[in-house]
Amino acid sequence: MIIRGQFDPDLRKRIKQKKQIAIIPVGSIEQHGPHLPISTDSDIVTEISLRFSKKINGILLPTINYGISDEHFPFFNLSVKKSTLSKMLNDICGSLIKNGISRILIINGHYGNLDSLKDFERKKKKSRKIKVISYWKYMDREFDHAGNVETSIMLAISKNVKMKNAKKGFQTDGMSKQEISKINRLAQKSFPKVTGNGVWGDPTKSSAKLGRKIINEVVNNLVKESNLTY
């Protein structure tokens, strides 16, 4: 159930009748190369959360579209402080609990949000019913930024993709784990310096078919995770 557009009496009745799982998608607004929209992270996590919520009959909250994206400057980004995102989630979860919903799953769609979400989790460690996950950890492939994975997913869910502008970005093929780890740390400080064009991976062979496969894999694994948690 999408909470937006619901009516108070119906919502309170549903909460009273059965324990609910609230789903909070968290994305970002930031550059995704010349071929994907700046809303890519939010678009993907919203779609995955929507499909997941239908599978478990959960309550889908509006996506938090603003994340921590300073590392993409001077390419375009709309970023908030780490403390801001953590406090916002704390307030939203507190309000949900006050209204009778204590089982809360936060689905993250942006790598740069991780530190803030980990901080939030530490503060909420006593509450086993509040869980933070990143959707890309539920697929059996290497994640990227505007590369094959994200571009394929966007082709599966959106018409707002300019494949004619897609170009290969920074790739880690042949690099050791230590080298990749070092590059990752550099990218967290300045993504444009590492990638050049804002792309991590190769989007040129992306397809909607692969995107649909990835989405199904992620959603099915999220359902399994939810069953184990709640």
Give the role of each language-model region.
Residues 1-103, 111-230:
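Extended, histidine- and acidic-residue-enriched regions that form the cofactor-binding/catalytic faces
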